[in-house]
Amino acid sequence: MSLLQDIVVIITGSASGIGLATATAALSQGARILGVDVSSAPVSLNEHPNYKFMQGDLTHETTPRQVVETCIKEFGGRIDGLLNIAGIMDQNSSVDSLSDYMWERCIAVNLTAPVKLMREVIPIMRQQQSGSIVNVGSKAATSGASSGVAYTASKHGLMGATKNVAWRYKQEGIRCNAVCPGGVPTGIVQASDPSTWDKDALGTMSLIHQAHAADRQKGLGVEAEDIADCLLFLISSQSKRINGAIIPIDNAWSVI
């Protein structure tokens, strides 16, 4: 029997990219999934009996609570895992070219929404005395030289929240970890408009980006499925003593 058989997991950003790859893999191993996304449900999972979908904007005040209420309605009272995958990029803006809108939107999607979802699931996990949360960061969560200031700050903040939650609830059977993908080809970059990017800031990071781009040209690039494998490991019992970890998945890009 799979280690994920019948566990209940909430996956945000499940309509594409890492979220879709993770939901697909989890379902293949017997998990029951509530997928959440601002976009419509992925056609590839529409007919799966263990996949339920909720469309919604996680930055809206009531959405995080509605997510948990929907999960309980669909699958009963348990929530075994929360995978905070949904995220957006900024315009690679430096602090002196940053708009209020981009700052507030990045913080809302990448930091506030995951924290509010953790706030909603923690009481259920405390009652169960078990549960695993994994937050998806980025190379920019541990570096100042790979993205704009808003995205970088939001992902650094999420790593701090991850560590705090891990320490606070470690004696109650609840784990909280993070993974930091680097250079995964998903729709997150394509969703932003290149004409609005801060070209000067991007130029200062070009050598960092080029160092990683060479891996993909040699067939060594990181794929969404690679991230999914680690996420599913972290919500399984095989990782039961891994708590508060920040795990890079970038073929050593994070060492520079």
Curated annotation (Swiss-Prot):
- Phenotype of null mutants: Drastically reduces the production of andrastin A.
Taxonomically, the superkingdom here is Eukaryota
N-terminal signal peptide: none
Part of which pathway?
Secondary metabolite biosynthesis; terpenoid biosynthesis
Name the Pfam families for this protein: adh_short (PF00106)
Q: Where is the active site?
A: 151, 155
A single GO BP: terpenoid biosynthetic process
Q: Which residues form a coiled coil?
A: none
Q: Which SUPFAM superfamilies match?
A: NAD(P)-binding Rossmann-fold domains
Question: Under which EC number(s) is this enzyme classified?
Answer: 1.1.1.-
**Record keywords, A-Z:** NADP, Oxidoreductase
Oxidoreductase is among the record's keywords:
yes
Report residues binding NADP(+): 11, 57, 119, 151, 155, 184
Query: Could you say which enzyme class this protein belongs to?
Result: oxidoreductase
Name a GO molecular-function annotation.
oxidoreductase activity
Family, similarity comment: Belongs to the short-chain dehydrogenases/reductases (SDR) family.
Q: Describe its function.
A: Short chain dehydrogenase; part of the gene cluster that mediates the biosynthesis of andrastins, meroterpenoid compounds that exhibit inhibitory activity against ras farnesyltransferase, suggesting that they could be promising leads for antitumor agents. The first step of the pathway is the synthesis of 3,5-dimethylorsellinic acid (DMOA) by the polyketide synthase adrD via condensation of one acetyl-CoA starter unit with 3 malonyl-CoA units and 2 methylations. DMAO is then converted to farnesyl-DMAO by the prenyltransferase adrG.
What name is this protein filed under?
Answer: Short chain dehydrogenase adrF
Organism annotation: Penicillium roqueforti
